[in-house]
């Protein structure tokens, strides 16, 4: 107890020396857990605000970084070296230290909120992409992604459209289902890193064979579909 009182007296009214290091490391850990946050976001779907305090990872990030810094000699004052983050909070009575942790928590919540808003845009774009594929596909027919007017004739050997598209697919064993899957996966994959809808075109390669390309002027992406 005496050590705790000396510690509080030493830093009373000043910024705790661990604050900036802990804050930076928490922010970095949250950003590194971006894919984990996206997975959690996908799992809850419409229950976006169902997490504790409206957060998905902030508490977990703060606890993990706390434990990581505990393992580094001298990183935290000895009074904090408890078995769990919650236990340490229970003994903290210094208003400056509590305010510091709350400040860090609020910053992390804002960072997480910004990431979630980005994820919402990504998921919205994915839905638009899927809608685009649905619009291209009617029953057992697919609208040509190049002209967006005529239905494609799809066989195991070729794909052809009245607009002039002709692609030899003999070596690929093409079908309506396979083409639909290729278009859907390509649009979804593009949507992970760009929010603009790409366009489709046909180009002849060096060997003389025609291929279907998907390209985007926004992100300069170009993908061979088939």
From Swiss-Prot:
GO cellular component, one term: nucleus
Subcellular localization: Nucleus
Pfam families: RPA_interact_C, RPA_interact_M, RPA_interact_N
An annotated GO BP: protein import into nucleus
Keywords: Metal-binding, Nucleus, Zinc, Zinc-finger
Record text on subunit structure and interactions: Interacts directly with the rpa1 subunit of RPA complex. Interacts with importin beta, but not with importin alpha. Forms a complex with the RPA complex and importin beta, which is dissociated by Ran-GTP.
Database matches in PANTHER family: RPA-INTERACTING PROTEIN, RPA-INTERACTING PROTEIN RPAIN
Annotated protein name in UniProt: RPA-interacting protein A
């Amino acid at each position: 107890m005496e050590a705790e009182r000396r510690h509080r007296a030493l830093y009373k009214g000043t910024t705790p020396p661990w604050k900036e290091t802990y804050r930076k490391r928490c922010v970095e850990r949250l950003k590194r857990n971006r894919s984990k946050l996206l997975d959690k976001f996908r799992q809850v779907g419409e229950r976006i605000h169902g997490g504790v305090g409206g957060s998905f990872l902030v508490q977990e990030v703060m606890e993990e970084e706390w434990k990581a810094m505990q393992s580094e000699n001298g990183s935290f004052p000895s009074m904090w070296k408890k078995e769990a983050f919650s236990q340490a909070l229970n003994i903290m009575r210094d208003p400056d230290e509590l305010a510091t942790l709350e400040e860090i928590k609020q910053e992390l919540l804002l960072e997480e909120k910004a990431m979630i808003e980005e994820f919402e845009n990504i998921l919205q774009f994915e839905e638009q992409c899927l809608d685009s594929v649905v619009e291209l596909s009617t029953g057992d027919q697919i609208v040509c992604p190049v002209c967006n007017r005529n239905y494609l004739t799809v066989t195991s050997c070729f794909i052809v459209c009245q607009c002039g598209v002709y692609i030899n697919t003999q070596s690929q064993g093409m079908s309506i289902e396979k083409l639909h899957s290729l278009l859907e996966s390509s649009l979804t994959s593009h949507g992970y890193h760009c929010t603009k809808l790409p366009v489709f075109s046909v180009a002849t390669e060096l060997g003389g064979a025609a291929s279907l390309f998907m390209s985007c002027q926004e992100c300069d992406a170009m993908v061979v579909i088939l």
